[in-house]
Amino acid sequence: MISEASSRPGFITAPADPVGEYPRASRRFESALLHIEVLSAMNIEKLLGGFANVAAILTPLVAVLAYSRFLWERRQKRLRLESYLREQKLFECTGQHSFLHLVATLGMFEADIMDASYRSKVISRNVAVDVAGEPVRIVLEYEPDDLEKELPKRPGRGQF
């Protein structure tokens, strides 16, 4: 026997009881439950689709924020190194400092100090030599802003 629920679109009826048919109320109840399950599955798919769209929008925003934070931290490290070397240059005669001294004083890694010194226009890297003339270590020194030293003689190429 075909139920009233099966003739309506969107309703799924339960299979017939092998012994006898379900009472009329239970068939409608099961049909309503199946309809609710189908609707909730559709809503979950829409909800997951919405979350996927939001994630697709937020991913590049988070990436831009992370990259800008990375650049800001690099700039802060460079400025901290430049200001420390500038102050030391004013109060000391040489103003040259080794990496070990800068690591201990500034609390930065050697790689960060080297990176900041390469990106700076006012920090020069020099080689300290021993009595025999052998290179011992690299020292950093603050050089005042001199426009002629900052501009390269051959545009587009670094000076060595």
From Swiss-Prot:
GO cellular component: membrane
Protein name as annotated: Uncharacterized protein y4lN
Organism, as annotated: Sinorhizobium fredii (strain NBRC 101917 / NGR234)
Membrane topology according to the record: Single-pass membrane protein
Keyword Membrane: yes
Ranges annotated as spanning the membrane: 47-67
Subcellular location: Membrane
Keywords associated with the record: Membrane, Plasmid, Transmembrane, Transmembrane helix
